[in-house]
Amino acid sequence: NDTLVSDTANFGNLPWREVFTDPQLQSLIETGLKQNTDLLSAAQNVKAAEASLMSARLAYAPSLGLSPQGTISSFDKNAATKTYSLPVTDSWQVDLFGQLLNSKRNAQVTLKQMKAYRQAVQTQVVSNIANMYYTLMMLDRQLEITKATAEILKKNAETMEAMKDAAMYSINSAGVEQSKAAYAQVLASIPDIEQSIRETENALSTLLGEAPHAIKRGELEAQVLPTELSAGVPIQLLS
């Protein structure tokens, strides 16, 4: 599994550690590269393909065989003479139809495909972890702003109602009810945001190969990303 972590490469021309500099995010990516089930499965497929290629190469080597032989002879009623030999024989499979060569080529193609697949899975794991991590920070910020907005609207509704009761500035009931409705609408959105946070944390935990749990994270304002990044996530994010 260590090779999966050390086998990291570029986001465009940048190592992912330079792209994602948040220590918490780096730790999550390392965990994902070690424990993600899809990635571990892809690594096993690469090992199986390597073993298949080795087997195809060994098919070119001669097979060795031991053929122990023995004889017993007796002349003129003398004591029997025992003779033993242990010859080593070798044989080569005659590849009349190129079967060995085709087998080797197929194994090479399979190995390349499995390595490409593993690299694609690694790329997807890193990008998904980063995406969910930043989503969590954006949801945190959204929750913070929503709570602050709800508090402002609550005070505004209370102030307008007090002014109406005191018959100040021609505040009518419709204006008060409108301010209360705005407060209630914003307040009702808070549980939805909190639910989105929990669902995103659970999804990220699953991606990391762990049971659902709270995810430690930084703040959105503290994130620093390169100013120029090409669109999309290139396959060589990990190589």
Where are these regions (language model features)?
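A short structural micro-motif
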Residues: A48-S52, Y183-V186
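Periplasmic alpha-helical coiled-coil/stalk elements that build and connect Gram-negative outer-membrane
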Residues: V109, A116-I235
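Small/polar-residue-enriched beta-strand and adjacent coil segments characteristic
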Residues: A9-N10, L14-P15, F20-T31, Q35, ...
